[in-house]
Curated annotation (Swiss-Prot):
Organism whose genome encodes this protein: Magnetococcus marinus (strain ATCC BAA-1437 / JCM 17883 / MC-1)
Annotated SMART domains: BRCT, HhH1, LIGANc
Membership in a protein family: Belongs to the NAD-dependent DNA ligase family. LigA subfamily.
Sites where the protein binds NAD(+): 30-34, 79-80, 190, 213, 250, 367, 391
Name of this chain's protein: DNA ligase
Molecular function, one GO term: metal ion binding
Gene name, Swiss-Prot/TrEMBL: ligA
Biological process, per Gene Ontology: DNA repair; DNA replication
Job of this protein: DNA ligase that catalyzes the formation of phosphodiester linkages between 5'-phosphoryl and 3'-hydroxyl groups in double-stranded DNA using NAD as a coenzyme and as the energy source for the reaction. It is essential for DNA replication and repair of damaged DNA.
CDD domains, alphabetized: BRCT_DNA_ligase_like, LIGANc
HAMAP family registered for this protein in UniProt: DNA_ligase_A
């Protein structure tokens, strides 16, 4: 009974996991999955003989290893030749065409030799050059060629050998024929992930081994670690797979996971990873698989290696479809394209999309689609002739640190910034790079004059990765942490346990005021269109803005504004209109705009929903605030401290007197002031947490749409949470939701919520 139940649980759990992680479809609630998982764990603990290689309980990580065993690849994991320009791709396509046309000629001649015993004819073939055309169906064309050639041979075959002219004529006609074939080659194009290549071996559908690429001939056994990666099926789905199947793929770390991992390391004062590739490699090669399990690695499959006891399709695109059907994750960006122009168009599209992807890529891989044509093209040295890696501009480059400047942020954080000798990184000229904080600067020991590696990826601010070792480094001056604010001269301070160094000047510091005004006017706050960085700086230089409330006095200075550089009458009119309109913004936007430390968009909404007015919030105690969902004691103390400061009280009174609605009027219940009664909205009473990276829109955009439908978007998961919307690279919130029995929705279900399609299990949790 236990054995059959364990087998049933394994089958169901693996099916649910495949549906969730590969197909992005949740078939059961996370609470139900968790219950079945615990049941299987209990059965296996009671009877270890029930544990099988495909048990999902293996994903949590096993015992710590003493080292990695070497593994010999049965089929070498070769590298690819690189292309760096459009011309390189055109040349690659031309070489493919020539190679295929040549293979037709050589095979035709070889067949002719074998048929008639002409052992010396091959010497006349040599290696035909510059043949244009391609053999789309080699066998059919060979037959066509032979039917064309055979009438040319004389009755006495030996006389052909004595006639170089006749043999040369045959070869000429063969080459002409090959050149006249349709010029059509299909490729499959895929993103080139910047991760770690490895292989998975399945015996009768069960994962039996995983190995890193290593040197291509020999890698390391990482089977225990691969089992912890959710994208790696422990047992293949469906049927039709070979008895022994080796799958090739790339392990990578999503960008959001990488940033989170490094942020946590910085907080602990530990060494950070230079890039997601290093993070993925370091995570996979941990001796303790439990560490690997905690790192959130993902995988895409891109082909097969050794196959036994079965056959695969001729077309690579069909092989990818088969792999997906067997439960393996393949890139949704893969496309079948035709010819050089198809390859070029794909790389352009992928390049435009590169910075929106949730993982890092460094190019595209282009492979001839037909396996038969691949065999005819063969290999050269270490790489196949039928594939090419097109490389995007590098995201890391070396340059020189010319200076280290200090920036003071809205909350007083002082950030060291390296001023660099201009360098092109990823197609963008970089002149500045963050050093994050002074503890990180000291750990990397960056000095003015150093040669450094600078990294830029996606929307991430360029950063100094490391110093390039040189003898001159020791002679350079060590950069010392400042004891006073570089702008206002106030003493610097560091709160207990924090890595950030702060200016203690508060609103007496012009740098903090400038950043505070920019934040107040930003899109997610009061949304004052046209009031950006340069204009705020201009207004402060002119003495027109010294604090936030001065924005609402600018209408008194219209003539002065018109006279400012880069401002005309129309621009001033538009600016003043935008400022006037901002007076009606919602309480949530107003609170976020105040810049209270640790009060983001979501928490500002929670405070606005809980209190009836600004006066009520200002009178709240720490105990009052801690009772609100998403508010912890640290944040509560910061909110109370903010409103207790006299200069903040004076500023809020000024905003009230100047007509800013949220500063003086009772707060409305409906989200973001849309003017619709909450009870009439389809998602009224539903609290939603967003986590991970969404493919179709940002989390902020999703939050706005949900709030517009009456939902309350909160920051953390609790037993009262209505649902968790989970994108790619979800973190600890997913595990917490599963533990609390909170329904988990994918992006497709989120779109359903936007349409008012509410699943029954979520309707039951709505408190409207």
């Amino acid at each position: 009974m236990s054995a059959s139940r364990a087998a049933e649980l394994r089958k169901r759990l693996n099916h649910y996991a495949h549906s969730y992680h590969t197909l992005d479809t949740s078939l059961v609630s996370d609470a139900e999955y968790d219950r079945l998982f615990r049941e299987l764990q209990s059965l296996e603990a009671a009877d270890p003989t029930l544990i099988s290689a495909d048990s999902p309980t293996h994903r949590v990580g096993g015992a710590i290893l003493e080292g990695f065993e070497k593994v010999r690849h049965r089929v070498a994991m070769l590298s690819l030749d690189n292309a760096f320009s459009a011309q390189d791709l055109v040349e690659f396509h031309r070489r493919v065409q020539e190679g295929l046309a040549e293979s037709v000629v050589v095979e035709a001649v070889q067949h002719y030799q074998d048929e008639y015993g002409l052992s010396d004819l091959g010497a006349l073939v040599g290696r035909p050059g510059a043949l244009e055309g391609v053999a789309r169906d080699v066998t059919q064309r060979l037959n066509q060629t032979l039917s064309f050639v055979e009438p040319l041979q004389p009755p006495d075959t030996k006389s052909l050998l004595s006639s170089g002219r006749k043999a040369a004529d045959i070869l000429r006609r063969l080459r002409l024929w090959a050149a006249e074939q349709p010029q059509r080659v299909e490729y499959v194009a895929e993103p080139k992930l910047d991760g770690l290549a490895f292989s998975l071996t399945y015996a009768e559908g069960v994962l039996v081994r995983a190995a890193t690429r290593g040197d291509g001939q020999e890698g390391e056994d990482v089977t225990a670690h691969a089992r912890t990666i959710q994208d790696v099926p422990l047992r293949l789905q469906g049927a039709g797979y070979p008895a022994l199947l080796e799958v090739r793929g790339e392990v990578y770390m999503p960008l959001a996971t990488f940033e989170k991992l490094n942020a946590e390391a910085r907080e602990r004062g530990e060494k950070t990873f230079a890039n997601p590739r290093n993070a993925a490699a370091g995570s996979l090669r941990q001796l303790d698989p439990k560490i690997t399990a905690s790192r959130g690695l993902r995988m895409f499959c891109y082909g097969t290696g050794y196959v036994e006891g079965g056959t695969l399709a001729d077309r690579y695109a069909e092989i990818l479809a088969a792999l997906k059907g067997w439960g393996l994750r393949v890139s949704p960006e893969a496309e079948r394209v035709e010819g050089a122009q198809g390859c070029l168009a794909y790389t352009e599209r992928l390049g435009e999309k590169r910075e929106t992807l949730p993982y890092e890529i460094d190019g595209a891989v282009l492979k001839v689609d037909s396996q038969r044509l691949r065999e005819r093209l063969g290999f050269v040295a270490r790489a196949p002739r039928w594939a090419m890696a097109f490389k995007f501009p590098a995201t890391e480059e070396s340059t020189t640190v010319q200076a280290i400047d200090l920036q003071v942020g809205r909350t007083g954080v002082i950030t060291p910034v390296a001023r660099l000798e201009p360098v092109a990184v990823g197609g963008v000229t970089v002149t500045n790079a963050t050093l994050h904080n002074f503890l990180e600067l000291a750990r990397k020991d960056v000095r003015v004059g150093d040669r450094v590696i600078v990294r830029r990826a996606g929307d991430v601010i360029p950063e100094v990765v490391r110093v390039i070792p040189r003898e001159s480094h020791g002679a350079l001056a060590v950069y010392k942490e400042p004891v006073a604010c570089p702008v206002c001269g106030a003493p610097t301070e560091r709160e207990g346990g924090e890595t950030a160094l702060r200016c203690s000047g508060g609103l007496t510091c012009r740098a903090q005021v400038k950043e505070g005004v920019k934040h107040f006017a930003s899109r997610k706050a009061m949304n004052i269109e046209g009031l950006g960085d340069k204009l705020v700086a201009l207004l402060m230089q002119a003495g027109l803005v010294e604090r936030i409330s001065d924005l609402y006095r600018l209408h008194e200075q219209r003539q002065v504004l018109v006279g400012l550089e880069r401002l005309g009458g129309k621009s001033v009119a538009n600016l003043l209109e935008a400022i006037e309109q901002s007076k009606a913004q919602s309480a949530a936007r107003f609170l976020f705009g105040l810049g209270i430390r640790d009060v983001g968009v979501t928490l500002a909404g929670s405070l606005a929903a809980h209190f009836t007015s600004l006066d009520a919030l200002m009178a709240a105690t720490v105990e009052d605030l801690v009772g609100i969902e998403d508010v912890g004691e640290v944040v509560a103390r910061r909110v109370v401290h903010f409103f207790a400061q006299a200069h903040h009280g004076a500023e809020l009174a000024a905003l009230r007197a100047l007509g800013v609605a949220a500063a003086g009027e009772p707060w409305r219940v409906e989200p973001d002031g849309h003017g619709v009664a909450a009870a009439e909205q389809p998602l009224s009473g539903l609290s939603v947490v967003l986590t991970g990276t969404l493919a179709g829109l940002t989390r902020e955009a999703a939050a706005v749409r949900l709030e517009g439908l009456g939902a309350k978007v909160v920051a953390s998961v609790s037993g009262k949470t209505g649902c968790l919307v989970c994108g790619e690279s979800a973190g600890s919130k997913l595990a917490k939701a599963q533990k609390a029995g909170v329904p988990v929705l994918d992006e497709a279900a989120l779109e359903g919520l936007f349409r008012g399609e509410i699943p029954p299990e979520i309707q039951a949790r709505m408190q409207g």
